[in-house]
């Protein structure tokens, strides 16, 4: 009986997702109440999916058409892998999980990932964001206003670490949030990452104070 109920819940969930009209179609602009996103394709991540052994799904890139800078397409920024983010008192994963709380079950069942591409200015403020998701019903059912709220909260609460070490006006960073494991496991892992983020935040604050102190002596 229990197995029958679980199967019924699964098919109802899948049916609900498949019955919804997809928000994101290649080459089109999808409109929300607060903003609109242009939808394009990035073929790079198809290879990554094959390597990871997950079902091959086309990647969907969402870019806010109301961005003030339009730097992603013009490539007027310094791209360097491994740029650290200041994620305290709130982490990027915490922001994403909170806004996608209602969709967590479907995202976890499908073992999906979201890539968040960011541009920061010389002060470390995040000024432009684009999302990379998979062409999967669980993502397709999420309205653009949800991504907009994630984008706005990231801009308010996340900063780039040590932006002064770059010569360019804008610096690129990327992070990914995965939905691998149970919801409980994801939240427990996020708490551990938050503690590490706190330690790094304190380290970065102390390093900045020491540098300012050295510069004041010159």
Regions found by a protein language model. Give the residues of each.
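Bacterial Sec-dependent N-terminal signal peptides
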Residues: 1-26, 218
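Charge-biased low-complexity segments
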Residues: 20-218
């Amino acid at each position: 009986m229990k197995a029958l109920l679980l199967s019924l819940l699964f098919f109802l969930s899948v049916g609900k997702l498949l019955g919804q009209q997809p928000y994101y179609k290649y080459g089109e602009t999808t409109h929300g109440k607060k903003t609109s996103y242009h939808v394009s394709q990035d073929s790079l991540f198809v290879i990554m999916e094959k390597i990871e052994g997950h079902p091959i799904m086309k990647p969907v890139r969402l870019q806010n058409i109301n961005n003030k800078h339009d730097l992603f397409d013009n490539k007027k920024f310094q791209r360097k892998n491994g740029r650290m983010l200041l994620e305290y008192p709130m982490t990027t994963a915490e922001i994403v999980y909170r806004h996608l709380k209602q969709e967590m079950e479907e995202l976890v069942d499908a073992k999906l990932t979201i890539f968040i591409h960011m541009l920061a200015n010389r002060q470390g403020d995040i000024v432009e964001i684009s999302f990379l998701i998979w062409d999967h019903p669980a993502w397709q059912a999420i309205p653009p206003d949800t991504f907009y709220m994630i984008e706005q909260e990231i801009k308010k609460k996340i900063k780039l670490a040590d932006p002064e070490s770059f010569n360019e006006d804008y610096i690129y960073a990327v992070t990914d949030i995965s939905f691998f494991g149970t919801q409980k496991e994801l939240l427990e892992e996020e708490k551990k990452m938050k503690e590490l983020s706190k330690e790094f935040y304190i380290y970065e604050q102390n390093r900045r104070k020491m540098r300012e102190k050295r510069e004041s002596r010159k």
